[in-house]
């Protein structure tokens, strides 16, 4: 509520609510101070990697932008698509789908948003649309057997993730079609909106090319290092996808090499780092405070109790329709439960309830995995969400308001498709 009503910044909202909750739990004797301190440490421990990743990824892409690498790349892209807004949205969808083959939300945001955001700016397209297309595509691709939600659900069922995924495939295919449809639909929406801005905006975007005019006016541009910067960026992305080292370490090394090669001298290097510090630290602090929030609510068992309460609300007469009910509610629930609490807390409870009515546990899991995934990257309790909105420069409340209805719709269509195709039965 604090986030959506814009009462305060996310970091303060997370730490305030979690501190008040912790104080109440300690005061009532539910937990000791030492136990609560442990919960907080565990919560921060779970997100500190993402926070560090955000700091150094922002710095890395900031350095590449300063050096003028993206100016040339975007110039080439603009020549290909021209003023074709729909072409841009389809390209966004394609990059997000391919980028999410590794199942990592953070890496997909890092690949897609820095590459496409300058194009959106040039064409006067909304950043929220960029994020919406990204999260729709990523939500569908996150169903892969090595994706976190599928693996968690499979572990609860006691089966291999490949076995669960093989049942999900028909719904995933429908989801991919919806992702492409999302790109086309919102491409038309953006095209109409830009038309209302007047021809000047479109003409301004169409005049863009990859000449050195901007670089000459930018004292930080390093056109001679373009090839090196492209190779460095590709190397960083490849190592990220290979998952050999922690993501944040890859960006640490990338930052070090990028700054050392492009900018000589301690004074200039310090200036470059400071110029990107504000955006990186602001979002990193939000992620760390979200970790405190998750630690208190998850480790104290509050989320698990919420899951049990949710299961208890379902009428006995509706028991056999449990997969459909949970499928319909999955998107709103994604905003309340983190991934672990959702699958390790709520799923086992619902399976036990479903057993009383002869409901196939796999069908409950499939409904929860597919429908919930649509909202994974708009959830305020998912650390990767903050990486995405931070890179795009969008407020969390605006991201949720812009995407929630659409993601819920995609989720419901996937659910109906599952029923029609026989993936989920009564």
Where are these regions (language model features)?
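Hydrophobic alpha-helical transmembrane segments of multi-pass integral membrane proteins
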Residues: 55-56, 82-115, 313-352, 356-357, ...
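Transmembrane alpha-helix interface/packing and boundary motifs in multi-pass membrane proteins
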Residues: 2-8, 61, 95-104, 135-142, ...
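Re-entrant/interfacial helical elements at transmembrane boundaries that shape
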Residues: 72-74, 106-119, 147-159, 306-308, ...
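Membrane-helix interface "capping/anchor" motifs
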Residues: 2-13, 121-129, 265, 274-275, ...
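Core transmembrane alpha-helical segments of multi-pass membrane transporters/permeases
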Residues: 37-71, 97, 248-249, 256, ...
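Membrane-interfacial loop-to-helix junctions in multi-pass transporters
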Residues: 45-51, 77-91, 122-130, 224-228, ...
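Long, contiguous bundles of hydrophobic transmembrane helices that form the permeation core
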Residues: 1, 20-24, 28-29, 166, ...
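Membrane-core helix-loop-helix motifs of multi-pass transport proteins
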Residues: 118-205, 220, 360, 384-426
């Amino acid at each position: 509520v604090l986030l959506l009503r814009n009462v305060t910044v996310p970091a303060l909202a997370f730490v305030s609510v979690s501190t008040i909750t912790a104080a109440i739990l300690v005061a009532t004797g539910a937990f000791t101070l030492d136990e609560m301190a442990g919960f907080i440490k565990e919560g921060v421990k779970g997100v500190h990697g993402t926070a560090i990743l955000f700091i150094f990824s922002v710095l890395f892409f900031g350095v590449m932008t300063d050096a003028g690498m993206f100016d040339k790349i975007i110039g080439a892209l603009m020549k290909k698509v021209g003023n074709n807004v729909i072409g841009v949205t389809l390209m966004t969808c394609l990059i997000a789908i391919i980028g999410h083959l590794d199942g990592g939300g953070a890496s997909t945001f890092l690949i897609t948003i820095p590459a496409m955001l300058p194009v959106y700016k040039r064409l006067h397209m909304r950043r929220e649309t960029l994020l919406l297309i990204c999260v729709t595509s990523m939500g569908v691709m996150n169903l892969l057997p090595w994706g976190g939600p599928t693996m968690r659900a499979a572990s609860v069922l006691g089966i291999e993730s490949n076995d669960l995924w093989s049942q999900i495939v028909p719904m995933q295919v429908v989801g991919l079609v919806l992702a492409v449809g999302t790109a086309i639909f919102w491409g038309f929406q953006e095209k109409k909106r830009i038309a209302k801005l007047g021809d000047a905006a479109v003409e301004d975007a169409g005049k863009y090319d990859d000449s050195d005019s901007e670089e000459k006016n930018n004292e930080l541009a390093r056109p001679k290092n373009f090839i090196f910067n492209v190779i460095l960026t590709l190397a960083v992305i490849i190592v990220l996808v290979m998952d050999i080292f922690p993501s944040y370490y890859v960006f640490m090394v990338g930052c070090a090499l990028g700054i050392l090669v492009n900018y000589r001298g301690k004074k200039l290097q310090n200036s470059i780092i400071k110029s990107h510090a504000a955006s990186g630290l602001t979002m990193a602090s939000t992620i760390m405070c979200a970790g405190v929030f998750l630690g208190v609510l998850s480790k104290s068992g509050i989320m698990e109790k919420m899951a049990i309460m949710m299961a208890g609300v379902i009428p006995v007469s509706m028991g056999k329709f449990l997969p459909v009910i949970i499928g319909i509610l999955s998107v709103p629930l994604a905003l309340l439960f983190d991934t672990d609490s959702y699958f390790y807390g709520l799923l086992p409870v619902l399976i036990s309830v479903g057993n009383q009515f002869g409901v196939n546990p796999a069908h409950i899991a499939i409904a929860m995995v597919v429908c919930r995934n649509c909202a994974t990257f708009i959830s305020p309790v998912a650390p990767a969400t903050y990486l995405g909105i931070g890179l795009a420069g969008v407020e969390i409340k605006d991201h949720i308001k812009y995407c929630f209805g659409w993601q819920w719709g995609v989720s419901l269509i996937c659910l109906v498709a599952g029923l029609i195709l026989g993936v989920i039965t009564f």
